[in-house]
């Protein structure tokens, strides 16, 4: 069994950085080093007092120390890591662009008063969960050891649990919307038309190359990287420059996670 340090060092760079920032943001608020209100997304303060840091800091706050906070961190460690090590393997720039696009989408949605929420960290985590569920739709998930379901339905099951326990559901809904928009633009629409309008910008690739983040970008995506949507096949999210217009292989080839169960609280 690996030590906590070895496990941490084994994490892929973008997921590790995001999870670390989320953890220390909560630590800082719990120790009183910074008040949550000073990092919240408050449009009036952003526009009138130019407190533009709020556009970024709100994305790293998952709430105070609690069971829900622990679950969100586990979701990053489980689903974010599996995405970055799976369909985004050797595509660090594409994964970073996905996170940037998701963050931007959430910020735009928050401009609408109905969708506004002061912190979008949970929404960004939920976006990762949604994309993971589309990538590995046939993985078996055990919810607290009580119910087993296909991963394709996990975001909706988590949403239902928040409804039952009286937790806010808007962050979950925002994450689903942002995740589906990214999935539509990088998988569904390219499969239908052969055109990908959300390729990873060159400046993102330059950042990754300049700072030597992650593995070098693969010139060609591995076969089976782009899959069909829906519970019948594991789609390949991420429409970076390495996007292939070929359709996914038959369902029988997408069996990497079929038959394996994961407990949410493991």
Swiss-Prot record:
Residue stretches spanning the membrane: 21-41, 56-76, 95-115, 157-177
Keywords: Endoplasmic reticulum, Membrane, Transmembrane, Transmembrane helix
Subcellular locations according to the entry: Endoplasmic reticulum membrane
Membrane topology (Cytoplasmic): 1-20, 77-94, 178-266
Topological domain ranges for the Lumenal compartment: 42-55, 116-156
Top-level division of the source organism's lineage: Eukaryota
Cellular component GO terms held in the UniProt record: endoplasmic reticulum membrane; plasma membrane
UniProt topology in membrane: Multi-pass membrane protein
Region (Disordered): 235-266
GO biological process, one term: response to stress
Annotated family: Belongs to the derlin family.
Function field: May be involved in the degradation process of specific misfolded endoplasmic reticulum (ER) luminal proteins.
Annotated protein name in UniProt: Derlin-1
Protein's organism: Arabidopsis thaliana (Mouse-ear cress)
